[in-house]
Amino acid sequence: MSGNLDILALKDDDVNKMLAATTHVGSTSVNFQMESYVFKRRPDGVHIINLGRTWEKLLLAARCIASIEYPGEVFAISSRQFGQRAVLKFAHYTEATPIAGRFTPGAFTNQIQPAFREPRLLIVTDPLTDHQPVTEASYVNIPVIAFCNTDSPLKFVDIAIPCNTKSPHSIGLMWWLLAREVLKLRGKISDKWELKPDLFFYRDPEEQEKEQAALLEAAPAAKEMYTDEPIPAVEEGGNWGEEAAPAAPAAAAAVPAVAGAAIPQMIQADDWNEDETQTAGSWGGATGGF
């Protein structure tokens, strides 16, 4: 499927990621249509998936998704809790339409209901749990891409990507790989994608609460380095003379002789002004007498 092109070949780094996420581990039973994707069977009865075939089908699915002119007409669906976060992240980066959670029956066939949609391509996490949208897609001729385990039914599935659909890490990694290849074909990213696959992994709400509690316990130790007292606000446009006024009595107490001498002079100056006014008035009267 890669056409002997290095850029489309399966890299060792991707193989290591698949092995770490147990993407190659299937189930104990095999559907007759999935036998061609099984590499071998372990002594404990678990079937091993051929990762070479997984990569070929992943590239084929990425080409089909990239060929859609309007990305919003591609619907990513996951009713399983482990795949809902991965579906939302895939839709965010590829501009697809996500349906995470319960699928409304008749969304593809009943034109009367408000939730009616007409997608051009459907991607499901597991055809066994997402059987309702897969069945409705067959009624309206919508092609379906599905991540399939060794025991998954391939009825109404057009492109099956063999992988482990029971591991949260495997589901998140496969959605991450599919999003990366789609963005490569659209020319939006280079060979390497800086986004980590951990962002697509399912996170348990209880573990998140424990992490938040641990952060809250560590927060008081960090707060001891700082004071909780509020900093007084500085009033803008205040009268700076009012702030210096309280210092005047202290200065007067320090030099009482100078302050006491200055007061009579000010009174005398006021009296002199009053006398001058009265004298001028009497002089005018005297002048008028002549």
Curated annotation (Swiss-Prot):
Source organism superkingdom: Eukaryota
Name under which the protein is recorded: Small ribosomal subunit protein uS2
UniProt xrefs under NCBIfam families: uS2_euk_arch
Keywords recorded for this protein, A-Z: Cytoplasm, Ribonucleoprotein, Ribosomal protein
Pfam families assigned to the protein according to its UniProt record, in alphabetical order: 40S_SA_C, Ribosomal_S2
TM annotation in the entry: none
Annotated GO MF terms: structural constituent of ribosome
Organism annotation: Culex quinquefasciatus
InterPro entries documented for this protein: Ribosomal_uS2 (IPR001865), Ribosomal_uS2_C (IPR032281), Ribosomal_uS2_CS (IPR018130), Ribosomal_uS2_euk (IPR027498), Ribosomal_uS2_euk/arc (IPR005707), Ribosomal_uS2_flav_dom_sf (IPR023591)
BP GO annotations: ribosomal small subunit assembly; translation
One annotated Gene Ontology cellular component of this protein: cytosolic small ribosomal subunit
Localization: Cytoplasm
Protein purpose: Required for the assembly and/or stability of the 40S ribosomal subunit. Required for the processing of the 20S rRNA-precursor to mature 18S rRNA in a late step of the maturation of 40S ribosomal subunits.
Cited SUPFAM superfamilies: Ribosomal protein S2
Keyword Coiled coil tagged: no
HAMAP family, alphabetized: Ribosomal_S2_euk (MF_03015)
Subunit structure, as described in the record: Component of the small ribosomal subunit. Mature ribosomes consist of a small (40S) and a large (60S) subunit. The 40S subunit contains about 33 different proteins and 1 molecule of RNA (18S). The 60S subunit contains about 49 different proteins and 3 molecules of RNA (28S, 5.8S and 5S). Interacts with ribosomal protein S21.
Family under the similarity heading: Belongs to the universal ribosomal protein uS2 family.
